[in-house]
């Protein structure tokens, strides 16, 4: 162990979006230096980092840093691989490789007896449609293997398979999965350090629409989710923060997917926990002791999606985090609002008020 005053680490972050921004914000409590690798110099994390490197300068970026982490696993492949080669990447590349192709992630769950919805791997779109017909009677989910996040590349099919004949033209592998009629969706934020010490924040209830998180709240106490996430982190020999999303069906827990990084469903920890997921991630990757995952009160979060205009009345119900992105796009996460309360019902009421204020005409995703 060490004192942060004895070693002032230089921490490199791949990606300059809001997750990197919040990592840097939370890290400013300590004498750390932050470098960001990002093409857009006006990106949220670049605006507050000590230095922002261009992607072509990834070797200098890695060589200048003591440890490298990432806010998003689908970018800067050469930089990720060079950081792994240099022995500086945390979480390690094995977790990223599972996320590069969805079928590898699903097969990993099967190999390690981690519960997940029934699925098949198809070699191309034509085989995917055949499997959907023969195994699931044309009711299920076809998922493209690459680039899947925030609901992208997923096709929910309910006996309207004729609308999806365009998938026959796709020549890459796909996952064909049963459609799960879940009671609700949930997630958990866990941390694991270099010595294998594991901690978890309480799970939360999540509400997603068209594959993108709209809001979440907790705590939702479910030890089964904790143990499944623990097993997953141990099988990966994981270091850092991880988000694990699950379906809850009649009390049974099925893994939907994991994210090898700080996660949208953990934003509430900025105000609802003693130590946020972002600080906990930094502690894990530089070798500090993990802190307690103590929740100070029931809490939750609402995403601000596709708009840069919200009513000032929102401030009555929660704390706004504004990412100051340069361009507004449909579905784009422009900020979020954290709420706390004396109990879950109060938190849910505040979330309802915020939803009504931000999305006056309903969600348009």
From Swiss-Prot:
EC class (word): ligase
Cross-referenced PROSITE patterns: ATP_GRASP (PS50975)
Gene Ontology MF, one: ATP binding
One GO term (biological process): 'de novo' IMP biosynthetic process
Functional pathway: Purine metabolism; IMP biosynthesis via de novo pathway; 5-amino-1-(5-phospho-D-ribosyl)imidazole-4-carboxylate from 5-amino-1-(5-phospho-D-ribosyl)imidazole (N5-CAIR route): step 1/2
Binding site for ATP: 102, 143, 148-154, 177-180, 185, 256-257
Keyword ATP-binding part of the UniProt annotation: yes
Domain ATP-grasp: 106-286
Keywords in alphabetical order: ATP-binding, Ligase, Nucleotide-binding, Purine biosynthesis
Superkingdom of the organism of origin: Archaea
Pfam families recorded: ATP-grasp, PurK_C, RS_preATP-grasp-like
Protein role: Catalyzes the ATP-dependent conversion of 5-aminoimidazole ribonucleotide (AIR) and HCO(3)(-) to N5-carboxyaminoimidazole ribonucleotide (N5-CAIR).
HAMAP family the UniProt entry points to: PurK
The family this protein is said to belong to: Belongs to the PurK/PurT family.
Subunit structure of this chain's protein: Homodimer.
Designated name of the protein: N5-carboxyaminoimidazole ribonucleotide synthase
Organism: Saccharolobus solfataricus (strain ATCC 35092 / DSM 1617 / JCM 11322 / P2)
């Amino acid at each position: 162990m060490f004192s942060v005053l004895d070693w002032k680490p230089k921490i490199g972050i791949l990606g300059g979006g809001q997750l990197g921004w919040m990592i840097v914000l939370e890290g400013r409590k300590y004498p750390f230096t932050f470098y960001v690798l990002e093409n857009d110099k006006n990106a949220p994390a670049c605006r507050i980092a000590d230095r922002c490197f261009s992607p072509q300068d990834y070797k200098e970026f890695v060589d200048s840093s003591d440890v490298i982490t990432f806010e998003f696993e689908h970018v800067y492949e050469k930089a990720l691989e060079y950081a792994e080669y240099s022995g500086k990447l945390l979480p390690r590349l094995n977790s990223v490789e599972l996320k590069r192709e969805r079928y590898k992630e699903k097969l990993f769950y099967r190999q390690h007896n981690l519960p997940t919805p029934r699925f098949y791997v198809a070699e191309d779109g034509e085989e995917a449609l055949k499997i959907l017909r023969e195994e699931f009677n044309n009711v299920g989910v076809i998922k493209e293997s690459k680039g899947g996040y925030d609901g992208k590349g997923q096709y929910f099919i309910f006996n309207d398979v004729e609308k999806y004949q365009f998938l026959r033209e796709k020549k890459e592998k796909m996952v064909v999965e049963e459609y799960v009629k879940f009671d609700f969706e949930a997630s958990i934020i866990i941390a694991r350090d270099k010595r294998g010490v594991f901690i978890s924040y309480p799970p939360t209830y999540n509400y997603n629409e068209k594959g993108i998180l709209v809001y979440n709240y907790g705590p939702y106490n479910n030890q089964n989710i904790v143990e499944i996430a623990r097993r997953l982190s141990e099988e990966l020999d994981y270091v850092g923060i991880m988000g694990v999303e699950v379906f809850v069906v009649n009390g049974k827990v099925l893994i939907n997917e994991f994210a090898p990084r700080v996660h949208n469903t953990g934003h509430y920890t900025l105000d609802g926990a003693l130590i946020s997921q972002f600080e906990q991630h930094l502690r894990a990757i530089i070798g500090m002791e993990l802190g307690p995952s103590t929740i100070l009160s029931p809490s939750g979060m609402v995403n601000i999606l596709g708009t840069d205009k919200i009513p000032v009345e929102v401030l009555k119900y929660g704390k706004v985090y504004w990412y100051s992105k340069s361009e507004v796009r449909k579905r784009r996460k422009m900020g979020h609002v954290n709420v706390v309360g004396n109990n879950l019902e109060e938190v849910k009421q505040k979330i309802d008020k915020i939803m009504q204020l931000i999305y006056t005409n309903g969600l348009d995703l």
